[in-house]
Structure formats: C-alpha cells, structure tokens
Amino acid sequence: MSKAQRAEVDVMLRQPQPEGPRSVEEIRAGFRALMARMTVPDTIRTTRTTLGNRPALRVEPHDGPGAGTILYFHGGGFVFGSPETALSLTGHLVARTGFGAHSPDYRLAPEHPFPAAIDDTLSAYRALLDSGEAPSSIAFAGDSAGGGLSITTCLAARDAGLPLPAAIVAFSPSLDATRTGRSMDTKEAVDPVFTRKAVEHTGAMYLAGADPHQPLLSPAVLADLTGFPPLLIQVGTNEILLDDSTRLAERARSVGVDVILDVTADVPHVFQAFAGVLDEADEALDRAALFLSQRIRAAGTPHTSTK
C-alpha cells in the first residue's frame, strides 16, 4: 500500500471547482469527465439493452459469463452518473468473478425525484426474476447512491414479497438522508470529494420535499433489515458518509444478518474506482469478488472461480 498513491488520488479529487453553485448539467458533465479517467478492464464487453422498461448496460467477460448475475446500481447522488460512469467498478467485478452484470440506467433527480430510482431498480430486479433467473444466482451491488439503492431495493423487494438476492455489495453507500452521522462533520476536513453543503444540495433535489425520516431514504437509522442476505460494506475513513456504513452494519448485525464491514484507512469515497492506480482499490475489489463468488456458490448455483 502506497502513501504516494493515496496522495496522488487525493490531489486529483481536490482539483479546484468553479465558484458558486453549479447547474445540474455542469455537475453531470464534471462527473462524466472524472469517471472517464478511470481504468476499465480490457477483458470485458458491453452491450446496450433494456431491463424493466429502462435502458441498461450488459457487461460480460469476453469469453462469456458464468452462472451468476450482478445487478449493479451506479452512483451519483441520485442526480448524476450512469452505467457508463460506473463501468470501472462494474467491469472490474465482472472481470474478477466471471459473472455477467446488468446496470440499469435508472431515472435521475431533479427531473425524477424519490422514489423514481427505487421504482426503476426494483423493476430491473423483477425483470431478471421474470426472465427465469433464480434469486440465488443474483447479487446486488452499487456505489455511493447506488450502494444505497442496493439496500433500499432489497427493502422494497422484501416488502413486495419477492425472493431476495443471494448477496449485497455496497461501496461507500449513501444511507442516511437525515444526515445525522457524526462523520458528516468530523470527516469533512479529510474528505476530498464531498462537503455537507454539497450532499445536502443534491440530496434536496432527490427528496423534492419528501420526509427523509423513512426507511427507503435513511435505512442506516430507520430500516428493519430482518431477513436480509449476506452483506459486504466497503468504505474509506476519509469520507463524510463513513457513519452511514458503520450504522447500517450495526443494524444488520442486531437482527442476525451476516455482515462484513470492510473499512480501509486513508482512502476516499468509492476508492475502488481507482483500480490500477491505488493498491487498496485492487485489493478491495478482490475481496468483493471473493465474497460474491462464495455467496452465490453457497446459494447453490454453479459459478466461475474468482479470476
């Protein structure tokens, strides 16, 4: 693990931003430009498709997928991002597990506020089940807002009476729209990505006046996680959303959920996106791939060994 690598990533993320609030279009363009700098494996192929009446990206190994499916939810504060901006993450999970992935292009705020994103991700999961895929062969995964969706989509599926997936992997998930975690303030000085003001700005677009005190918006403090599948949460210490992860893990443990809280020191929000640049990113993705391969195998489905 290299302090020099961590410093390089920190400098990249702290590039000066324009003064004053940015428009939604400027925020989206800036995020696309940042994520275009991330490394995508050359051992995958992508295909545009539809899933649950929404556009989606199908990601597969070049030599074809094994018997397992990752339903991947991209990050972006529910306001920006796309399956393409998350391809460094989806692609590395696919390359490491041999599974195929679907990444739905769920609707974004402010044009489509809560609960549009959850409606779309739940619809994507229904579509996989309706196509004949066994829930034991499906895992949810996501980063940031998409990490939050991996939890809230599972809540919505359980409440709808659907069978739950085999496992969940959440990278730096956003899990508390009430913004009550202590790390929102104690970590602001070391977080190179977010400030409280920034997440409250985009969060307000997603809420559109909705009360944040409800499980589908703040699962870290309000959700009953009873019956959830095994859960892996990966988070860095240099992020204001750290307590979203620690509190959700505590809630999961309290109701008997098999949960791994995987905290990496001195790395930023969704540090896994820096695979190939940051040793900790590659190591975390290796752990996530092993977790997925083991859990889908434990559910009784054939699988491809972790590569």
Question: What is each model feature region?
Answer:
Residues 155-213:
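Hydrolase active-site cap/lid region
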Residues 82-83, 102-137, 275-281:
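Catalytic nucleophile-loop/oxyanion-hole region of alpha/beta-hydrolase
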Residues 1-64, 293, 297-307:
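A glycine/proline-hinged amphipathic helix-loop "lid/cap" segment
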Residues 84-103:
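Short amphipathic alpha-helix adjacent to the substrate-entry channel of hydrolases
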Residues 247, 253-307:
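C-terminal catalytic histidine-bearing segment of alpha/beta-hydrolase fold enzymes
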Residues 233-235:
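Short beta-strand/loop motif that positions the catalytic acidic residue
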Residues 67-76:
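Short beta-strand element of the alpha/beta-hydrolase
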Residues 142-154:
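Glycine-rich nucleophile elbow surrounding the catalytic serine of serine-hydrolase chemistry
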